[in-house]
């Protein structure tokens, strides 16, 4: 795995930016042409990582009015001019042995150091997904429908979602949304399964993710309308029972207070 990160640069290199600006503006090439009243001078420090910190490439770029003039690359181990205007600067930097050694060392002191500091909050960060299942339409058994597996609030984005029907993987009629960024370093996606539920069918959404020790498996069971009605009635009765129990306790508590008076 490889990547590129722009990281914090120490004060020494910012001093170098001022120094190289003065050198550049004092060169004969700069004096022989009109110098704009307003100009932009940029310094960019880039760290390239391969397999974590197994291989680190450090690059610094000096840019004057959107034109790069000088560059240091740890693969070269020295400064080189990108344009003729940058030749005096590259020669000057390479002649400053202490400064050159400092720049060479920054593959470790800047890149590798900041990699370890930032890792727990960036590429090593992991957030477990939340998985739910729902039908797109409330329909009776034996009617075509769409079963949706919602996988939300996970990081990183690498994830595997599969549908199973009665322990057999379903591949036909499976449609997934693209990975959706939530804007807070988490993702979500939806995996839909076209199906015609039969009584007794058990559908399972299986989710595998780096943050999980084992896959998350959420089930949905096909039920007849009468079974659903009985279940809802049972839930409703249980809730009403809790309400009446609570009211009874309140009345009993108040009556006890009245007797004590």
UniProtKB/Swiss-Prot annotation:
Residues 33-230 are extracellular. Disulfide bonds join 47-111, 149-205. Residues 221-230 are annotated as: Connecting peptide. Keywords: Adaptive immunity, Disulfide bond, Glycoprotein, Immunity, Membrane, MHC II, Signal, Transmembrane, Transmembrane helix. It comes from the Eukaryota. The chain crosses the membrane at residues 231-251. GO terms for cellular component: late endosome membrane; lysosomal membrane; MHC class II protein complex. Belongs to the MHC class II family. Residues 33-126 are annotated as: Beta-1. This is BoLa class II histocompatibility antigen, DQB*0101 beta chain. One of its GO terms (biological process) is peptide antigen assembly with MHC class II protein complex. Residues 252-261 are cytoplasmic. The keyword Cell wall biogenesis/degradation does not apply. Residues 129-233 form the Ig-like C1-type domain. The gene is BoLA-DQB. Gene3D superfamilies: Class II Histocompatibility Antigen, M Beta Chain, Chain B, domain 1 (3.10.320.10), Immunoglobulins (2.60.40.10). Glycans are attached at residue 51.
